[in-house]
Amino acid sequence: PHIIEDAAVPLVKMSKVFSVLKNIEKKYKVKTIIYGHIGNGNIHVRLISKRKNTKLIKNIAIEYFNEVIKNEGTISAEHGDGLARSEFVKKQYGVTNYQTFKKIKQVLDPDFILNPGKIITKKSTVVKNLKKY
């Protein structure tokens, strides 16, 4: 599954993030494919697995996203927040910005019919919206 498709960190933090990914592989006994746009710190990660263990995938995503944020990075550098990362938006941008996002959404879309579940959500989304290629 393609679970962590779009994180980016400052170049000086990339070796730390790669170490974190290697530790995640060991901890969860998984293998990953890591690629991206190293020149701008953008990292794509895929699990090498045909199984869909949602608890495992969610744990990996939470741990990795927390590390990216801790290392002054973003979990949505190239492709936007989308459905898979919506549950992490509040942590990424902070409570104040998240509340601002909610207010804007309520003003522009009071019936929540435009892009439901994107960015503003209370549901867990990371495993529900996995890419399978």
Where are these regions (language model features)?
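Phosphate/diphosphate-binding loops
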Residues: 7, 13-25, 30, 49-77, ...
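Short Gly/Ser/Thr- and Asp/Glu-enriched loop/turn motifs at secondary-structure junctions
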Residues: 37-42, 78-82
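Short glycine-rich loop/turn motifs
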Residues: 31-32, 42
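A short beta-alpha structural unit
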Residues: 8-9, 42
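Gly-rich Lys/Arg/Thr-decorated short loops/hinges at beta-loop-alpha junctions or inter-strand turns
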Residues: 1-4
